[in-house]
Amino acid sequence: MKASDVRGFTADQLKDELAKLKKEQFNLRFQKATGQLEKSSRINEVRKDIARVKTIARQKAAEVKA
């Protein structure tokens, strides 16, 4: 997921995307613990996607206040 794609989302879409990514992160951690995870790099990708979404949500909130 690119930051430019995320910037086009509304606040509600950002919340939904964040919830979806956190759920995926939980599932990936569970798969890792049980030894079923095939693509371990996906954990880092999801973690960075979560950071992107949170950063852009924070920036949008700051724009509204300013």
From Swiss-Prot:
Keyword annotations of the record: Ribonucleoprotein, Ribosomal protein
Single GO BP term: translation
A GO molecular function held by the record: structural constituent of ribosome
Disulfide bonds: none
PROSITE patterns the record matches: RIBOSOMAL_L29
GO cellular component, one term: cytosolic large ribosomal subunit
Keyword set includes Transcription regulation: no
PANTHER family: 60S RIBOSOMAL PROTEIN L35/50S RIBOSOMAL PROTEIN L29, LARGE RIBOSOMAL SUBUNIT PROTEIN UL29C
HAMAP family: Ribosomal_uL29
Family membership noted in the UniProt record: Belongs to the universal ribosomal protein uL29 family.
Protein name, entry field: Large ribosomal subunit protein uL29
Gene that encodes the chain: rpmC
